[in-house]
Amino acid sequence: MSPAMNSITDTLGTLLPNARKLAGVILKQSRFCFETDGEVLPCAFFVTADGQPSIVGVPELSDETKPSVWAMVAHLRRTHPITAFVSEVWMAKCEKDDMNPDGSVKVMPRDNPNRKEQVMLVLWQGSRQVSFTAEITRNPSHLGDWKVMFDSNFPGEKGMTSLGGAMMEGESYPMEAN
């Protein structure tokens, strides 16, 4: 059975008792960054040995910083029972109006101020991985509901796919942080 719950915090809470608290920190931080700066800055989150949620800011992801960021996340995964990583992902949807009749793009998504993009949250507990995405728009500024993209415990279910595959429509979670 898939992790269909009333909220993303309930889903995260089923993975580890302290995950509800961590989920609140993650969602509040993501919402605060987006409302303040118009973007979601990359961050790593983890639960300490005494069960407290903690946050680590990471540099903006680039070809130069990715190896050190992933090394840090890998270290957190080895040393903490639950780890999460949040970042905007470089993916934008092309609307039908942005396409030429031959299928080529007449307006590149990066040049469209009204483009729709994605924020991704990846959560690990031991060998289990659950990934969520939320759609964002910048004009007007809006951070949408979270959807399950992948759950390693349920790899074959509708709405979930491997990280290497195309994203499929997932289950929706109202944006909340309590």
Where does each model-flagged region fall?
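Low-complexity intrinsically disordered segments
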Residues: R78-N178
